[in-house]
Curated annotation (Swiss-Prot):
SMART domains: SEL1 (SM00671). Sel1-like repeats lie at residues 107-142, 143-178, 179-214, 215-250, 297-333, 334-370, 371-406, 407-442, 443-478, 551-586, 588-623. This is Protein sel-1 homolog 2. Residues 19-662 are extracellular. It comes from Mus musculus. The chain crosses the membrane at residues 663-683. SUPFAM superfamilies: HCP-like (SSF81901). GO terms for cellular component: cilium; membrane; nuclear speck. Belongs to the sel-1 family. InterPro entries: Sel1-like, Sel1_AlgK, TPR-like_helical_dom_sf.
């Protein structure tokens, strides 16, 4: 980036943020003393050395172990060498002697080895081995390894959370030009975690981080410019930031389909997290294994898929995946044959890359009409892997697979028409197939749709649509793996570690993370923020989630204004948010709350008839609302009757009705009958 342009952008940021009162309102509520951001290098090292001597950082255990394995193996993994005091001494010498700064070949090699392990496997045992190598590399002055260790302190990896130590190490690394450290300091400043809450400073950190190459900073800035958070809303600037990240993600996805991450919503089942459908329960997993060994082919294929990509809380394990696929393939499963072909086509530790073997299994699956097998053969011919390049054959197989609804084949057809590979360029057909594939969540199809909308290729240009699509692609980055580690941390009771991971994802624009962070803050279990900060920050995050379409968050904002949590009581604003949730999202809770406000005239004009209508709508919208609505209506009718008794002249009414002369001496039986009929009507509504 041009230095002058960077300086101008920073000045604009400072000017805009100084006009924003969010930081001022928030800082007035801060009472605790924040850690200064200007700490000398020697003090940093002295502090870290003290920590190690006290034993606060020398027992590093793996608290992120997969719960499925943890229930069977209760032992804890330990990283050897993390307690080595030489790490701090060498780092201290490294920073104090600029002339002698150098990353040794051995340290660089150790870091590369650790990084390779993380890229090739997602198992916790392998992660532990990787961090052991990072520790040794950091001992030798490797800056990237130091970044890894600072991250471990920040996020509480392996039970070693120490935010103060992380901040001081980040500050030292930032002075050496580390863009990851710049991003981390920006994140901490934006929340006021261990540092002063300062949005202007956070934006400056993010700007320098993005200029240095931080994809996270790029994504954060994209989200801020898209939503107008402490900057002037600017779709084109957001597009520029998001596109850079999306290009990076698309390049990774073209080499691998990536690993989908389960984004568990803490707001849905807070009382029973172990039953969450996004995470496979240990007992159910054991039952599936039993069925698979008994010969259940469908279960064998399912377990193979789960282990292949590491879903539902299971570790990625290529050996187990291949084991189950081979058993199912032997029983004649076309899907299993296709997945075996896929494993050999891509290559991994259990199934080394082998085009001939891939062709064999893809052909076996395709002969049974399997869409995955047909798509696999198309890929072999398209790329010329083990066979000559033949776009005609590739097109034929892609079309057959696409007709069966396989999204990857639909994407490949779209790409052929988009790029003109073996066919005439046809942007309308390209858009058609990209759109079809995107409906199933195919990430590269979403990326190319974003490209078309961003450039106006084959469609009318739309910045907003392009940004939303790019944002979806960006959220498939490797950083999304923190959803799983944050969830396990929360489940294990490590609330601070969970919160800080969700908070970073929330800062990057993930709506689920914004809701989860607000939920944790609202529970008042977090210790990394002062109690006076919890509700204001939770309100801020609920608001961001609501803007992204979360109905529950919208109702929460109404609740905060109704009760005065983190803000002043404001019934009118509460009613506004309840109305939005009721009208736009059809929220039964919002309808009920709004009905109550109309019933009592809180923030809006009292309207009994509208209150009745909203209560009825709430009952019709959600079965769970039937009982609360029944009692609310009973109370409303009772109060209405008492009101009539107190404020109306019933003598005149009875005289006007002339019940004795009109109905006869048994008029009281008629009234009783009417009351019984009304009760039957109410009971019918209750059970409807």
């Amino acid at each position: 980036m041009n230095p002058l342009a960077l300086l101008v952008e920073i000045l604009i940021i400072i000017e805009v943020t100084t006009k924003n009162t969010e930081a001022e309102r928030y800082n007035r509520k801060q009472k605790e003393v924040n850690v200064t951001t200007q700490v000398s290098v020697s003090k940093v090292k002295q502090f870290l050395l003290y920590l190690l001597e006290q034993g606060n950082a020398n027992k590093i255990t793996n608290k992120r172990e997969n719960p499925l394995e943890k229930k069977k193996h209760q032992h804890k993994l330990k990283i050897k060498g993390i307690q080595n005091k030489n790490l701090l001494k060498r780092n201290q010498n490294y920073f104090k002697n600029p002339a002698k700064k150098s990353i040794t070949d051995e340290g660089d090699e150790l870091f590369k080895m650790g990084n390779k392990i993380l890229q090739e496997s997602k198992s916790q045992k392998q992660k532990t081995e990787a961090y052991t190598l990072f520790t040794r590399a950091a001992n030798m002055g490797n800056l990237k390894a130091m970044e890894k260790m600072a991250d471990a302190w920040l996020f509480g990896s392996f039970g070693m959370q120490n935010i103060t130590a992380a901040i001081q190490l980040y500050e030292s690394l930032a002075k050496e030009g580390s863009y990851k450290a710049q991003n981390a300091l920006g994140f901490l400043s934006s929340y006021g975690i261990g540092m002063e809450y300062d949005q202007a400073k956070a934006l400056i950190y993010y700007t320098f981080g993005s200029a240095g190459g931080s994809m996270m900073s790029q994504m954060i800035l994209g989200y801020r410019y898209l939503s107008g958070i402490n900057v002037l809303q600017n779709c084109e600037v957001a597009l520029n930031h998001y596109k850079k990240v999306a290009d990076y993600i698309a390049d990774k996805l073209e080499k691998s389909e990536g690993i989908p991450v389960e984004k568990v919503r803490l707001t849905e089942r807070p009382e029973n997290l172990s039953s969450n459908s996004e995470i496979l329960d240990w007992d159910i997993y054991q039952y599936y294994k039993f069925l698979a060994e008994r010969g259940d082919v469908q279960i064998q294929v399912s377990l193979g898929q789960l282990h292949l990509i590491g879903r539902k809380g299971l570790d990625q394990d290529y050996s187990k995946a291949l084991y189950y696929f081979l058993k199912a393939a032997k029983a004649g499963s076309a899907n299993a044959m296709a997945f075996i072909g896929k494993m050999y086509f891509e290559g991994n530790a259990a199934a080394p890359q082998n085009n001939a073997t891939a062709f064999k299994y893809f052909s076996m699956a395709a002969s049974k009409g399997n869409a995955i097998g047909l798509h696999g053969l198309g890929l072999l011919y398209f790329h010329g892997k083990g066979v000559p390049v033949n776009y005609g054959e590739a097109l034929k197989y892609f079309q057959k697979a696409a007709e069966k609804g396989w999204p990857n084949a639909q994407f490949q057809l779209g790409f052929m028409y988009y790029s003109g590979s073996g066919v005439w360029k046809d942007y309308k057909l390209a858009f058609k197939y990209f759109y079809l594939a995107s409906q199933s969540g195919q990430p590269l199809a979403i990326y190319y749709l974003a490209e078309m909308y961003a450039t106006g290729t084959g469609v009318l240009r739309s910045c907003r649509t392009a940004v939303e699509l790019y944002k979806g692609v960006c959220e498939l980055g490797h950083w999304a793996e923190k959803f799983l580690t944050a969830y396990f941390a929360y489940k294990d009771g490590d609330i601070d570690s969970s919160l800080i991971q969700y908070a970073l994802l929330a800062e990057m624009g993930y709506e689920v993370a914004q809701s989860n962070s607000a939920f944790i803050l609202e529970s008042k279990k977090a210790k990394i923020l002062g109690k006076e900060k919890l509700y204001p920050m939770a309100l801020l995050l609920w608001n961001r989630a609501a803007i992204q379409g979360n109905a529950f968050a919208r109702v929460k904002i109404g609740d905060y204004h109704y009760y005065g949590y983190g803000t002043k009581k404001d019934y009118e604003t509460a009613a506004t948010h309840y109305s939005i949730a009721a009208d736009k999202h059809h929220s039964a809770q919002a309808m009920f709350n709004l009905a109550y406000m109309y019933e009592h005239g809180l923030g809006i004009a009292k309207d009994i008839h509208l209150a009745r209508r909203l209560y009825d709508m709430a009952a019709q919208t959600s079965p769970d609302a039937h009982i609360p609505v029944f009692f609310a209506l009973m109370k409303l009718e009772t109060m209405h009757l008492l009101h009539d008794i107190l404020f109306f002249n019933f003598t005149m009414k009875w005289k006007w009705l002339k019940l004795d002369s009109t109905v006869g001496p048994y008029w009281d039986l008629l009234v009783i009958g009417l009351i019984v009929a009304m009760l039957i009507f109410l009971l019918r509504n209750r059970h409807r």
